[in-house]
């Protein structure tokens, strides 16, 4: 039983099975994705955040999956700071971590996403950090992870992106998540590189940063909590003013919301004749939310009579 881990059934573990399960698959899609429209805007946000903390290593986790029941997880939503600064969208990538690595001498960032409106302007402030995106890329189909890991295995959750694909889409250097501990510890210490983490995003990463601080002789406890709060505050305030790309996204969300209400209105006749009419309306609106976005931002808030005034 112990060998099953979190799996509810026992998996075959012999070479014949491994040879069978790893063979006969069709080719994966070739080529690399185009650069994301969000990439240059995310680069500008990272540059703005880094300017507040020159010489410090900034750790921004996406967050972890949360179990709903058995081996089923809730739909994933990354931490807002990660999504905003990585520019990867609202479903990338459980357990990923964006690290803004301090440059020893501020200059042009090695990330290839251009900052909007300031390509080579010498008056533009030099970047203080290089972004590195750590995540778990897809494994080989000959690996045990491919068929044996219900959380990350391709057989269970579909094709995961490669490091090269995410680099192409984001313009951010990517690395395997297994290399994160060494990267956080590099040159850390008093009088050297300091660390800050968005502590609420991922408990495991926060614990890793705490351990790294302890080994490097950096402050922990309340002092570290205040340091981390400064990063969370700066990242949050950065989201207050929307850039042109975000404004376009808000307009698209408004249009999708209107379309959802249009579908809801068309469902009213069927809802009136159904014993759970409110669910008919919720379903109509929710379908549009899934088609045009990631889902509902809020559950239904409905009122009638004096409560609606």
Where are these regions (language model features)?
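A composition/biophysics-driven feature that prefers long, compositionally simple stretches
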Residues: 1-262
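Short catalytic-site patches enriched in acidic/histidine residues
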Residues: 67-78, 214-219, 229-234, 272-309
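Active-site pocket-lining segments that scaffold enzyme catalytic pockets across diverse folds
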Residues: 239-293, 298
């Amino acid at each position: 039983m112990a060998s099953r881990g979190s799996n509810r059934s026992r998996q075959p573990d012999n070479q014949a099975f491994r040879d069978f399960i790893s063979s006969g698959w069709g080719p994966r899609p070739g080529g690399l994705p185009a650069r994301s429209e969000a990439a240059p805007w995310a680069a500008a946000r990272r540059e703005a955040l880094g300017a507040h903390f020159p010489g410090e290593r900034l750790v921004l986790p996406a967050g972890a999956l949360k179990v709903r029941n058995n081996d089923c997880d809730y739909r994933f939503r990354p931490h807002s700071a990660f999504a905003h600064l990585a520019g990867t969208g609202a479903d990338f990538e459980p357990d990923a971590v964006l690290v803004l690595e301090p440059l020893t001498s501020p200059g042009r960032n090695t990330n290839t996403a251009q900052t909007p409106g300031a390509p080579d302007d010498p008056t533009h402030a030099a970047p203080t950090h290089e972004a590195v995106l750590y995540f778990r890329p897809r494994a080989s189909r000959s690996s045990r992870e491919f068929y044996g890991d219900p959380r990350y295995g391709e057989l269970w959750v579909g094709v995961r992106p490669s490091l090269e694909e995410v680099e192409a889409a984001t313009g951010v250097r990517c690395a395997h998540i297994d290399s994160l501990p060494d990267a956080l510890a590099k040159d850390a210490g008093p009088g050297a590189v300091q660390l800050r983490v968005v502590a609420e995003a991922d408990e495991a990463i926060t614990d890793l940063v705490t351990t790294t601080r302890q080994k490097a002789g950096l402050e922990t406890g309340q002092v570290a909590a205040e340091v981390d709060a400064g990063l969370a505050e700066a990242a949050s305030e950065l989201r207050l003013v929307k850039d042109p790309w975000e404004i376009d996204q808000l307009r698209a969300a408004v249009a999708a919301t209107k379309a959802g209400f249009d579908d809801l209105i068309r469902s009213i006749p069927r809802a009136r004749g159904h014993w759970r009419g409110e669910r008919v309306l919720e379903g109509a609106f929710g379908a549009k939310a899934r088609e045009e976005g990631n889902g509902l931002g809020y559950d239904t808030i409905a009122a009638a009579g004096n409560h609606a005034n």
